[in-house]
Design a protein with these regions (language model features):
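Short, low-complexity interaction segments enriched in Ser/Thr/Pro/Gly
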Residues: 4, 20-22
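Bacterial N-terminal signal peptides
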Residues: 7-18
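Solvent-exposed, well-ordered amphipathic alpha-helical segments
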Residues: 18-19, 214
């Protein structure tokens, strides 16, 4: 039986309790920055964590959540965390490449996970714990993985087959793997901050994007995209991280209580993610502004065959051993088309 990452952290912390120093300044303030709206799965989970942190510490900790890039933009937030200007983040996994750690881009490989249960074999098991542990050499404490969901493509023209992608400028997160993925479709990747995606689509600077449905809806991308094709081609998730020096200097009891709050928030985040995405898709349909297309089995197979070329091309960049470990954990066969 696998021990989850959160349980492992709790067991470690149980051995280090010490009373709160008499001169400790309370409440301890934690700035938690993220780039999406409060009504997304991540936004709701961050607020839930703040609530549980206050309750479990009996007011000794106050988590101030800054959503929608109000404190730091995509490209700045990880550096701000390392400098201690902010104490916690939940960046998408691709952004951790900014730390010089490419292994997290394994989650960007297309069609790697058949479903969320298969994904959780990685994020909730030994491999997920190992990946988060690699952040510590960069002054970052990895605490948990939060789901958003599986992505679909959008554009202002129907995307029913491989030729329909040709020449499109598609917004991605900064990620070598995502760049390679988009090029397998004959499209052009355009790495842009999430906060600027709507405007870039509205002005025609880019032609399309890839997002889970909750992002399409909460960012009102349906207003500037006429078509969404339900591909479920890739996963978008987040790492909940903290400044390591800040985390290590917390009293042991506070660390234990915050780890418990993170565990509860993780269960909450992952529970609501699929619900939120399903509801968002129905809300997009209800606007009547965007047509939703479901690929046929043959169309999906064509797209999958093209995109799977990303695996062999990018495995050396990610780290072949990490890619192989994920294959083994999930039962994925890269040779099965």
């Amino acid at each position: 039986m696998k021990t989850t990452l959160i349980k492992l952290l709790l067991l470690v912390l149980l051995h280090g309790f010490a009373p709160m120093p008499a001169n400790a300044k309370l409440p301890i303030v934690i700035k938690f920055s993220h780039v999406v709206t409060p009504d997304t799965p991540k936004g709701k989970a961050a607020n839930y964590f703040a609530q549980r942190a206050a309750e479990l510490t009996e007011g000794a900790v106050s988590v101030e959540v800054f959503p929608n890039s109000t404190l730091y933009k995509d490209k700045d937030e990880i550096q701000a965390l390392q400098l201690g200007a902010v104490q916690m983040l939940a960046p998408s996994l691709a952004k951790l490449t900014q730390l010089g750690i490419h292994e997290f881009e394994v989650f960007d490989l297309p069609y790697l996970f058949d479903d969320i249960q298969t994904l959780h074999r990685v994020t909730e098991g030994w491999l997920g714990a190992n990946l988060l542990g690699r952040l510590e050499t960069k002054g970052v404490k990895g605490l948990a993985f939060w789901d958003n969901g599986f992505k679909s493509f959008s554009a202002n023209r129907p995307l029913h087959d491989l030729p329909s992608f040709k020449g499109l400028r598609i917004r991605i997160q900064p990620s070598k793997v995502l760049e390679a993925q988009i090029r397998t479709l004959g499209a052009q990747p355009s790495a842009l901050p999430f906060s600027g995606t709507y405007q870039a689509l509205r002005t025609g600077f880019i032609d399309g994007a890839e997002n889970p449905h909750s992002n399409f809806f909460t960012q009102k991308i349906y207003e500037v995209q006429k078509h969404i094709v339900l591909t479920n081609h890739g996963y978008l998730g987040y790492a909940v991280i903290a400044n390591k020096r800040f985390w290590d200097n917390l009293p042991a009891r506070i660390r234990y209580q915050l780890t418990q709050a993170i565990g509860e928030a993780t269960e909450y985040a992952n529970r609501i993610a699929q619900e939120e995405n399903d509801q968002a898709l129905q809300k997009i349909k209800a606007t009547g502004k965007t047509r939703i297309y479901t690929l046929s089995a043959a169309e999906r197979a064509e797209l999958r065959r093209a995109m799977l070329a990303t695996h062999a091309k990018m495995a050396p960049y990610i780290g072949q051993s990490v890619v192989n470990a994920v294959y083994e954990e999930t039962g994925f066969d890269p040779n099965k088309q």
